[in-house]
């Protein structure tokens, strides 16, 4: 290759440009290869993360929001299975009580429940949360509660209440809950002289990774969480607290309205298992600090997009637009049929 460059031109400037292009190409190829190797190691070679470092089986507590169903319920169940006591936070108290009884019976850990409708953003609810965890050695917080649009919708047609709820639930409540719980985590870690670490997981989305037309408010709310979580990670890591944004594509859940799992769409159990296995590892989010895309199919999708068209490209935006316009069209037709019936 060097001989070829020398033979192309005797002009020093041209040679310098060609050598520079060659070095840049080698650098890009090397970083791509190393990132791909790291992704594979994270997924299939490195052992699962040992939650003893977060206080599992040592009397420590995890707080999980949106804990009564789906992904949140799986976080609660799987963290309890690892030996963490759990504080279950969600809107419906009856579901929380039933889950708490199931967890205590099956995993022999302690539980607390708190009925908390985050869409109301009531100060009394945050005070109740603070009171619930006041005497608990909390080491883990899972910010799982979230809301999307009922169906894809142009921003200019978005219902004001839906817009407000998305921002309140995904952003305001997440930040305020973290302000309540994170100081307890920092205190617990400090009291043990950092022999136990803290962990804050916040649910992100491909909607935040890729600007998504027809889900503009939801997409923006999740993109906000990316920057906020990364900034918080920088602040709390020196204090012994790991902060990660968890990126996912679709998972079978009430919010996604998908009932049947597939290779690219896991059920909550498989998804949460991948999250907890890979805490502290980027997996598909190789280009991002304090971020993980842990489920294998989502990881390769994330890695592929970043290393091909790019997350902010016109191509990615147009593909997303077409997909969500189609989803909206089908949803409206289905609603029209149901109305006739």
Curated annotation (Swiss-Prot):
TM spans (from-to): 17-37
EC numbers for this chain: 1.1.1.330
Compartment(s) where it occurs, according to its Swiss-Prot or TrEMBL record: Endoplasmic reticulum membrane
Single GO cellular component term: endoplasmic reticulum membrane
InterPro entries named among the record's database cross-references: 3_ketoreductase_fungal, NAD(P)-bd_dom_sf, Sc_DH/Rdtase_CS, SDR_fam
Keyword Transmembrane helix: yes
Membrane topology note: Single-pass membrane protein
GO molecular function: ketoreductase activity; very-long-chain 3-oxoacyl-CoA reductase activity
Pathways involved: Lipid metabolism; fatty acid biosynthesis
Catalytic reaction(s) noted: a very-long-chain (3R)-3-hydroxyacyl-CoA + NADP(+) = a very-long-chain 3-oxoacyl-CoA + NADPH + H(+)
Major localization class: endoplasmic reticulum
GO biological-process terms attached to the record: fatty acid elongation; sphingolipid biosynthetic process; very long-chain fatty acid biosynthetic process
CDD domains: 17beta-HSD1_like_SDR_c (cd05356)
Record key words, sorted: Endoplasmic reticulum, Fatty acid biosynthesis, Fatty acid metabolism, Lipid biosynthesis, Lipid metabolism, Membrane, NADP, Oxidoreductase, Transmembrane, Transmembrane helix
PROSITE patterns named in the record: ADH_SHORT
Enzyme class: oxidoreductase
Coiled coil location: none
Residues given in the record as NADP(+) binding sites: 63, 117, 144, 218, 222, 251, 253
UniProt keyword annotation of Cell membrane present: no
Protein role: Component of the microsomal membrane bound fatty acid elongation system, which produces the 26-carbon very long-chain fatty acids (VLCFA) from palmitate. Catalyzes the reduction of the 3-ketoacyl-CoA intermediate that is formed in each cycle of fatty acid elongation. VLCFAs serve as precursors for ceramide and sphingolipids.
PANTHER family: HYDROXYSTEROID DEHYDROGENASE-LIKE PROTEIN 1, VERY-LONG-CHAIN 3-OXOOACYL-COA REDUCTASE
Family: Belongs to the short-chain dehydrogenases/reductases (SDR) family.
Name this polypeptide is given: Very-long-chain 3-oxoacyl-CoA reductase
Source organism (scientific name): Meyerozyma guilliermondii (strain ATCC 6260 / CBS 566 / DSM 6381 / JCM 1539 / NBRC 10279 / NRRL Y-324) (Yeast)
UniProt lineage: Eukaryota, Fungi, Dikarya, Ascomycota, Saccharomycotina
């Amino acid at each position: 290759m060097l001989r070829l460059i020398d033979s192309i031109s005797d002009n020093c400037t041209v040679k310098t440009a060609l050598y520079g292009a060659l070095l840049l190409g080698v650098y890009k190829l090397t970083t791509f290869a190393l990132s791909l190797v790291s992704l594979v190691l994270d997924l299939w070679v490195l052992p699962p993360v040992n939650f003893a470092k977060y206080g599992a089986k040592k009397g420590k507590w995890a707080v999980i929001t949106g804990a009564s169903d789906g992904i949140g319920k799986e976080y609660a169940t799987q963290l309890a299975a690892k030996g963490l006591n759990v504080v279950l936070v969600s809107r419906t108290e009856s579901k929380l009580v039933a889950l708490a009884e199931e967890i205590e019976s099956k995993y022999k850990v302690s539980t607390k429940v708190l009925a908390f409708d985050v869409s109301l953003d009531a100060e009394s609810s945050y005070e109740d949360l603070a009171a619930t965890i006041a005497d608990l050695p909390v080491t883990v917080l899972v910010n799982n509660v979230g809301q999307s649009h009922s169906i894809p919708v142009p921003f200019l047609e978005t219902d004001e209440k839906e817009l407000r709820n998305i921002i309140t639930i995904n952003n305001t409540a997440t930040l305020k809950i973290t302000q309540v719980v994170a100081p307890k985590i920092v205190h617990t870690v400090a009291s043990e002289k950092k022999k136990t670490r803290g962990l804050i997981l916040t649910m992100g989305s491909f909607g935040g990774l890729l600007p998504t037309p027809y889900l503009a408010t939801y997409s923006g709310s999740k993109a906000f969480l990316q920057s906020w979580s990364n900034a918080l990670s920088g602040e709390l890591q020196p204090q012994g607290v790991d902060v990660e944004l968890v990126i996912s594509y679709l998972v079978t859940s009430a919010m996604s309205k998908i009932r049947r799992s597939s290779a690219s769409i896991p059920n909550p159990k498989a998804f949460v298992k991948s999250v907890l296995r890979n805490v502290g590892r980027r997996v598909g989010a190789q280009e991002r600090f304090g971020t993980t895309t842990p489920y294998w199919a989502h990881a390769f999708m994330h890695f592929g997009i970043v290393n091909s068209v790019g997350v902010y490209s016109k191509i990615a935006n147009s593909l997303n637009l077409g997909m969500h316009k189609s989803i909206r069209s089908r949803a409206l037709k289905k609603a029209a049929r149901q109305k006739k019936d």
